[in-house]
C-alpha cells in the first residue's frame, strides 16, 4: 500500500525503451532483453529512476508488439522469461524500477481468445470481443473509422458478423462489458507484479469503454462514442482495487484525445484509478486543421497555451501529468520543434529544459538524451510502420508527387523515433553486428552515446543536470506554475512558485535573438538570482535580456532572509 506522503514516482524520471531498436546482442538485427541489461550502467549514469519497456509479449508484430498474442510469454526475438527475470533483478540491483507496457483495449487476432471466439458464434470466448451484425442495407454496423485508416469493422464471413478494431484489422477490441474479460486481465497483471515489476503503462486505456448503443457518428470518425467512455472510470477504479492497491506501483495511462477534467479524475488519488496520464494535445500543434499527415510549422503560441493549461488545470484538480516530448509514436522533437542542423545541441537542451522544469513526471525516450534526429529516409523501402505504409499507398492513389510524399513521411512517420539507438561510430551505430531491422539514421558517426559521454557539454549531461535539479529542489515537484509573456512569439517563459523561492525558466524556441523583460512585480530587485542551468554562456541580471538563438536559462530566485 502507498503510505508515504510524496509517492516515489512524483520525484522519478522515466526512461522509455523500445526494445526492438535499443541494443542487439545476437546479431539478428533486432534489439533484445540482454541488450537492455548490457546498457543498465549507461542508464544509471544518466540518473533515471524507472525503465518503461514497450511491449515485450509474444506477438505477430503487425503493430510492433502492440498486437499481443500471449500475455504470459516473451516475444522470442527479445529473449526468454529467464532473460526478463534477470533484467528485473539487474535493474533492481541498480535501484532502477521496471514498468511494463500493457495493451488491454485489444489483442492480436492470433490470441487464443480470438481464435476461439471466431471459431463459433456459440464459443464461450465470443463475448470477449465486440461483434455486430451488418446494418439492414448490408453495410458495416457503424461508420466508425479505424485509427489506421478505413472502417473500424471487419467482416467474419463464416458468421456474417463484424468485429470491432479501432486500430489495425489484426487488433480486435476486447469487450470490457464482460466481467470475465476484466477478471482475466486483472489475473494477468498480478502475474507480472509477482515477477517483481514496479508498474504498468496502459496503452490507449481511455478507449476501453464503448457507448453500448453503437451509434453512427454524425461527423468525424466516431471517437466521441468510445473516448473517455461511459464506464471507463468505473473500470479503472475496479482495476486499482483488484490489482494496483496491492502493490507500491506506478501506473500511467495513455489517453487518446482526452481532456484535463477526465485526466484529473483518472489521477486524483482520491479516485483511486491511475497515478498519471499522457495526453497528446501539445504534439498536435503542427497538425494543420487537425490533419496529422500534412506539413505546417508548429503553432508556438498554441503549444504554450496547451502546456500551461495542463499545468494549471491538473495542479488545481489534484491530478498528475506525465511530461514528454517524444515516444515511439512521435517524430524526434529536435527535428520537430527545434533545429536538427546547426543548433541541434542547443535546441535539444532548450527543449529538455522547457519540459523538465514543469510539474509532473518526466519521460525521456531512448536517444532523446543524445539529441537523435529524424532519419530523413528517402526511399519507401526504409519504412516499416504500418500506419506510414498505409498513408504512402493512400497518397499514391490520390496521385500525390513522390517528393511531396517523401517530405511528409520524413516529418510525420512513427519510424522517425524507431531507428536504432546510436551507441558509437562503428557500423550501424554499434546497435547490431548484423543487418538492423530498420536502417540506422545516417548521422550516427557524429551523434552517438560514446561521443556524448566524452563531451561534458553534450545533450546527455544536460539531461543529467535536469534530473539532478529535480532531485535537489522540491519546488520542481511541488511548486505552482505561472506562464510569463504568454503572447511572446519566440519565448516560452514560466515561473514555478514555492514558499520562499521561485524558479524562473526562460526558453527561446527560435534560431533568432529575442528580447525578454521580466516584470518587476514577478521578481523584486531584492530577490537573489542564481543560475541553476543554462545551455549558453552565463549572463548577469534578469532585466532587459536579449536571448541568443535557442538559449535556455533556469534561475532560482530566493527571498533575502
Swiss-Prot record:
One Pfam family matching this protein: Alpha-amylase
RNA-binding recorded as keyword: no
Source superkingdom: Bacteria
Enzyme type, top EC level: hydrolase
Any one GO molecular-function label of the UniProt entry: alpha-amylase activity
Recorded effect of pH on activity: Optimum pH is 4.5.
UniProt activity-regulation remark: Activity is stimulated by high salt concentrations with different efficiencies depending on the kind of salt. In vitro, inhibited by glucose.
Record EC number: 3.2.1.93
Site entry (Transition state stabilizer), positions: 329
Thermal dependence of catalysis: Optimum temperature is 37 degrees Celsius.
Induction: Induced by trehalose and repressed by glucose, fructose or mannitol.
Principal localisation: cytoplasm
Cellular component aspect of the GO annotation: cytoplasm
Gene3D superfamilies: Glycosidases (3.20.20.80), Golgi alpha-mannosidase II (2.60.40.1180), Oligo-1,6-glucosidase, Domain 2 (3.90.400.10)
Active site (record annotation): 203 (nucleophile), 254 (proton donor)
GO process annotations (BP): oligosaccharide catabolic process; trehalose catabolic process
InterPro entries named among the record's database cross-references: Glyco_hydro_13_cat_dom (IPR006047), Glyco_hydro_b (IPR013780), Glycoside_hydrolase_SF (IPR017853), O16G_dom_2 (IPR045857), SusG-like_C (IPR056300), Trehalose_TreC (IPR012769)
Function (record text): Hydrolyzes trehalose-6-phosphate to glucose and glucose 6-phosphate. Can also very effectively hydrolyze p-nitrophenyl-alpha-D-glucopyranoside, but not lactose, maltose, sucrose or sucrose-6-phosphate. Trehalose is also hydrolyzed, but to a much smaller extent than trehalose-6-phosphate.
Family: Belongs to the glycosyl hydrolase 13 family.
NCBIfam families: PRK10933.1 (NF008183), trehalose_treC (TIGR02403)
Protein name according to UniProt: Trehalose-6-phosphate hydrolase
The encoding gene: treA
